[in-house]
């Protein structure tokens, strides 16, 4: 009987661990961005807004914006939305002119995982 109870506790511990562990291994994935990927906007954005699946660390996160002539677009320091630690805001120093822009973003999630990606959008 003691052996059966021990086996049951062991099986329950393994099941519980397998249900909890995947969330620890998660990475911050980009869930939404503004301007959206492949969007053609008529009004130039004042900032790039990136939303992730989990909270991000602003000190290790940011974005590089490249313009139509492959030039670097000046940005201000990235900041996190005060009400939403999953949202990173990258203010633009100057207004964007018409053309296609590439956003190369990188984040470190609150659990320490690094993620990066890129997308493009156009200003008409």
From Swiss-Prot:
InterPro entries per UniProt: CopC-like, CopC/D, CopC_dom, Cu-Rt/internalin_Ig-like, Ig_E-set
Record has Signal as a keyword: yes
Residues of the signal peptide: 1-26
Residues engaged in binding Cu cation: 27, 113
Keywords carried by this UniProt record: Copper, Metal-binding, Periplasm, Signal
Family named by the database record: Belongs to the CopC family.
PANTHER family: INNER MEMBRANE PROTEIN YEBZ
Protein name: Protein YobA
Lineage: Bacteria, Pseudomonadati, Pseudomonadota, Gammaproteobacteria, Enterobacterales
